[in-house]
Swiss-Prot record:
Its main location: plastid. GO terms for molecular function: proton-transporting ATP synthase activity, rotational mechanism. This is ATP synthase subunit b, chloroplastic. NCBIfam families: PRK07352.1. Keywords: ATP synthesis, CF(0), Chloroplast, Hydrogen ion transport, Ion transport, Membrane, Plastid, Thylakoid, Transmembrane, Transmembrane helix, Transport. F-type ATPases have 2 components, F(1) - the catalytic core - and F(0) - the membrane proton channel. F(1) has five subunits: alpha(3), beta(3), gamma(1), delta(1), epsilon(1). F(0) has four main subunits: a(1), b(1), b'(1) and c(10-14). The alpha and beta chains form an alternating ring which encloses part of the gamma chain. F(1) is attached to F(0) by a central stalk formed by the gamma and epsilon chains, while a peripheral stalk is formed by the delta, b and b' chains. It comes from Rhodomonas salina. It is a single-pass membrane protein. GO terms for cellular component: chloroplast thylakoid membrane; proton-transporting ATP synthase complex. F(1)F(0) ATP synthase produces ATP from ADP in the presence of a proton or sodium gradient. F-type ATPases consist of two structural domains, F(1) containing the extramembraneous catalytic core and F(0) containing the membrane proton channel, linked together by a central stalk and a peripheral stalk. During catalysis, ATP synthesis in the catalytic domain of F(1) is coupled via a rotary mechanism of the central stalk subunits to proton translocation.
């Protein structure tokens, strides 16, 4: 508690020795005149510097704005050119798509036509092969029938032909040949 009393008494002493902030009615003691003279000197002497600095800054800002506007114009012209190129590219792409579709249709029709021709050729080849096979089979059947007929006639002739009849046939054939010679 003694410490608290000691601190409070020191605070009272320091507040009595210090002056507080407030308005000082003594004009010369407050240095208002000195401050006014200093401020007017700064304004008078610094005006040219400040004016030239502001003019330089204003000129730089104007140049920066003009450069930005020029870049904007250039960017807009490049944008228009790019849009024109995009439109041309899209037209070319569309043309390529149409050509591709046309080519695809042509190839499809060609493949279908070739397929039909191949089917017709295979069908004709099949028919031709069947006809050849039929003719060959008919020929084989005729040969077989002829062979059977010859065998039957041979068997019948052997049964019918006697040695006496055979010599008569030979004599008859010789006499026929003798008249022709």
């Amino acid at each position: 508690m003694n410490d608290f009393l000691l601190i409070s008494s020191l605070a009272e002493l320091s507040s009595e020795t210090k002056k507080s902030f407030g308005f000082n009615p003594n004009f010369l003691e407050a240095n208002v005149l000195n401050i006014a003279i200093l401020l007017s000197g700064v304004v008078y002497l610094g005006r040219n510097f400040l004016t030239s600095a502001l003019e330089v800054r204003q000129q730089k800002v104007a140049e920066a704005i003009q450069e930005a506007e020029e870049r904007l114009v250039q960017a807009n012209s490049r944008l228009l050119e790019s849009e024109k190129q995009l439109t041309q590219a899209q037209a070319v792409i569309e043309e390529i798509k149409k050509e591709a579709e046309k080519t695809a249709r042509t190839v499809k029709e060609s493949i279908l036509a070739q397929g039909k021709l191949d089917i017709e050729r295979l069908t004709n080849n099949g028919k031709s092969s069947i006809e050849k096979a039929e003719l060959q089979i008919k020929k084989q059947i005729q040969q077989h029938i002829t062979e059977l007929a010859i065998q039957k006639v041979t068997v019948q002739l052997k049964e019918y032909m006697t040695p006496n009849l055979q010599s008569k046939v030979i004599d008859s054939n010789i006499s026929n040949l003798g008249g022709q010679l």
